[in-house]
Amino acid sequence: LAKQDVVVVSINYRLNIFGFFMHPELSDQTGNFGLEDEMVALQWVKDHISFYGGDPENITYFGESAGGAHVSYLMASPKGRGLFKRGIIQSGAYNLFDWTSKNKSEELGTTAQTLLGVQNLQTMKNLPAETILSASASLGHPFGPNIDGELIPNNLTQLLEEGSFNNIDLIIGSNKNEDYMYIDENVTANDIDKLIERYYPEHKDT
């Protein structure tokens, strides 16, 4: 990339329960803290990339797997408008089906609080990070972006179908055989039913 006159910036964002946690006591927040981290990072790039030889009006946002899905979220977010000119989504499409409503995210946050045995959010926040992460592990690491009505205004697939997204250039691709890592020799019919219910709930009874 350096030989092609590209300035590459790698960013970090909060993950799992730390990046995508919602709770009734956080009603004034989106719960999509990881995506907010990414937006701050993109704004930093836009404000400072010229000092490194980059063009603030020619930013390409690239992500793979969950990162690819995050490119989609910000592409369809009103708050992401103007942060980047082009997007590259690599193996991120399956994540578009894995969305949660704000109410369900709040319920999940309350479940995590109960699992940790604390009375309120503030007490939960004072726990060691490892303890909080263990609660997420016990729940199967279910924390991800939620439809908060602000940063993510609606179901992403619906926004894309409606044409409600920012006008950017886009490349979409997939890694060959990427999902082989998830193949399990002991898959049961019940496992398949759970996958259908998670990603295609409208077809769970067919």
PLM region descriptions:
Residues 1-121, 159-183:
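Serine-hydrolase-like catalytic core of hydrolytic proteins
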Residues 123, 129-206:
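Substrate-gating cap/lid region and adjacent catalytic-acid/histidine neighborhood
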